[in-house]
């Protein structure tokens, strides 16, 4: 998902813990780069190459600096070649950034021509983060079962949030209490995700929540640690990273001790042919029902696929977005009351909230989209790998194996695309009233969820969950930074990825509930 992103802010602390490891291998990496230059996949697409500082500097410098300087080179390339294409040099390969003028001819091409899963695998160093690319089962399940079911799932989500707000927030009736907003949002989303994805039997078990959240963190930690290294070093570094080794152990535990037994139990009950048995109505069961091959149906494969979709496409990304939204409200408190007024109007009774009520939260929807415009998951989107030589309408040849993308960040901050792009306007998309103005809508001017047939399929579910959490939070709590915190915490940049800095405490206190 799109979508798909890097790192928890808390990774910064973990990176420090593993600093000794990193410095040793950083030195080794530089040595290898300088003396044995074997860069990862290079593309021979005939487009300008954007280098850091000067076009005359060796490409190796741009590769080494990409992780810390990516936004500057991405914006530089966009400013010069936004109507054509340009090339970026990453430590582990090349990216060809295409203009949105190619969007219409590319967006509907099949996976046999432009493969999104393979691009995701590459962008998230999938060989070391347990990403599966052997089928579209999870995407099919989202599109055919999850998204159409959102309306009837809302009461379950609300029920789980009622419980989650009780157990995850501190007692703060009489005074402001500090919380780590990202960690709280992470557990809220993880609880909701577990209720919908694995059902009632396991969703509130702390062993599941801990295992799935730790798994999520280790995925993004592994990505953050591996990205600075050239691709040819990944087999060495990836296999000795503590976070990568932890991932392997956690995956085995979840497969064999948690999800595997649950899947086998369900299949045993189905085999009995008991007329009183009702299949669980959750994502895991939907995948079991839709799996077409023996490989897709294997309990370990189902478990790994479910973990991937929940950790990367639901839990982490939603928690990051919620943290960004809260920070934006803290530094722009003038938007809090309009949001509360809308919530009180549209959600008169919290437990009776419907999908229609949530769709009517137009100001909130616009705020979510504007927050995402300023704090996208990454500067690049629409990642695809070209599966066979492809010639575009203007004659540009994309050889087989080329990794293409589009500059979603610069596009959404371009004054030719967005009026007054440097101004945060919470009502921007309420005023637009066009088909692409909704938070989950995609188009050439707003690509943070991707574009075309493989745009983030889980965005509809994530949007509903985020709106419910934000509605409950704004109705129930007052909140502020510490007195000495006067500015929004700066985002962290990991290559082209953008994550919130969650080292800043937030102080909350109960207020008279309005819903």
From Swiss-Prot:
It is found in: Membrane. Its main location: membrane. One of its GO terms (cellular component) is membrane. Its cofactor is heme. It comes from the Eukaryota. Glycans are attached at residue 501. The keyword Kinase does not apply. It is an enzyme of class 1 (oxidoreductase). The chain crosses the membrane at residues 20-36. GO terms for molecular function: heme binding; iron ion binding; monooxygenase activity; oxidoreductase activity, acting on paired donors, with incorporation or reduction of molecular oxygen. Keywords: Glycoprotein, Iron, Membrane, Metal-binding, Monooxygenase, Oxidoreductase, Transmembrane, Transmembrane helix. Heme binds at residue 456. GO terms for biological process: mycotoxin biosynthetic process. Pathway: Secondary metabolite biosynthesis. It is a single-pass membrane protein. Gene3D superfamilies: Cytochrome P450. Its EC number is 1.-.-.-. The keyword Zinc-finger does not apply. Disruption phenotype: Abolishes the production of the janthitremanes shearinine A, F or K as well as of 13-desoxypaxilline. Belongs to the cytochrome P450 family. Cytochrome P450 monooxygenase; part of the gene cluster that mediates the biosynthesis of the indole diterpenes janthitremanes such as shearinine K or shearinine A. The geranylgeranyl diphosphate (GGPP) synthase janG catalyzes the first step in janthitremane biosynthesis via conversion of farnesyl pyrophosphate and isopentyl pyrophosphate into geranylgeranyl pyrophosphate (GGPP). Condensation of indole-3-glycerol phosphate with GGPP by the prenyl transferase janC then forms 3-geranylgeranylindole (3-GGI). This is Cytochrome P450 monooxygenase janP. It comes from Penicillium janthinellum (Penicillium vitale). The gene is janP.
């Amino acid at each position: 998902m799109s979508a798909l992103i890097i790192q928890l802010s808390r990774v910064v602390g973990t990176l420090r813990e593993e600093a000794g490891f990193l410095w040793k291998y950083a030195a080794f990496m530089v040595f290898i780069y300088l003396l044995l230059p074997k860069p990862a996949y290079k593309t021979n697409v005939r487009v300008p190459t954007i280098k850091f500082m000067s076009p005359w500097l060796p490409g190796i410098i741009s590769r080494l600096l990409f992780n810390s300087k990516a936004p500057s080179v991405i914006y530089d390339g966009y400013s010069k070649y936004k109507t054509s294409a340009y090339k970026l040099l990453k430590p582990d390969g090349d990216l060809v950034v295409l203009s949105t003028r190619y969007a219409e001819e590319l967006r509907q091409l099949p996976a046999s021509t432009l493969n999104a899963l393979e691009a995701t695998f590459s962008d998230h160093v999938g060989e070391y983060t347990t990403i599966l690319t052997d089928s579209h089962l999870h995407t099919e399940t989202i599109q055919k079962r999850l998204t159409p079911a959102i309306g009837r799932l809302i009461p379950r989500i609300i029920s789980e949030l009622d419980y989650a707000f009780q157990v995850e927030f501190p007692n703060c009736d009489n005074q402001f209490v500090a919380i780590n907003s990202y960690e709280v949002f992470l557990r809220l989303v993880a609880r909701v995700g577990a209720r919908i994805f694995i059902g009632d039997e396991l969703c509130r078990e702390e062993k599941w929540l801990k295992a799935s959240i730790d798994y999520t963190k280790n995925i993004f930690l592994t990505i953050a640690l591996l990205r600075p290294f050239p691709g040819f070093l990944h087999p060495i570094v990836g296999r000795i990273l503590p976070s990568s080794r932890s991932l392997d152990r956690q995956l085995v535990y979840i497969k064999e001790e948690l999800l595997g037994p649950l899947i086998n139990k369900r299949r045993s009950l189905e085999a009995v042919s008991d007329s009183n048995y009702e299949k669980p109505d959750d994502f895991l069961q939907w995948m079991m029902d839709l799996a077409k091959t023996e490989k897709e149906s294997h309990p370990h494969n189902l478990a790994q696929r479910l973990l991937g979709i929940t950790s990367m496409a639901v839990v982490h990304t939603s928690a990051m977005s919620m943290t960004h939204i809260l920070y934006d409200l803290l530094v722009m408190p003038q938007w809090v009351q309009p949001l509360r007024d809308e919530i009180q109007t549209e959600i008169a009774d919290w437990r009776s909230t419907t999908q229609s009520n949530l769709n009517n939260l137009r100001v909130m929807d616009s705020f979510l989209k504007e927050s995402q415009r300023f704090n996208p998951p990454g500067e690049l989107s629409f990642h695809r790998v070209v599966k066979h030589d492809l010639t575009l309408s203007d004659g540009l040849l994309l050889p087989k194996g080329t990794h293409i993308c589009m500059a979603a960040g610069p596009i959404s901050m371009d004054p030719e695309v967005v009026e007054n792009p440097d101004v945060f306007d919470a009502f921007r998309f309420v005023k637009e009233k066009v088909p692409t103005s909704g938070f989950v809508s995609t188009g050439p001017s707003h690509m943070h969820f991707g574009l075309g047939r493989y745009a983030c399929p889980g965005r509809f579910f994530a949007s509903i969950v985020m709106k419910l959490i934000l509605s409950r939070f704004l109705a129930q709590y007052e909140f502020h930074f510490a007195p000495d915190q006067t500015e929004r915490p700066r985002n962290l940049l990991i290559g082209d990825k953008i994550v919130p800095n969650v080292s800043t405490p937030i102080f909350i206190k109960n207020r008279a509930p309005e819903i």
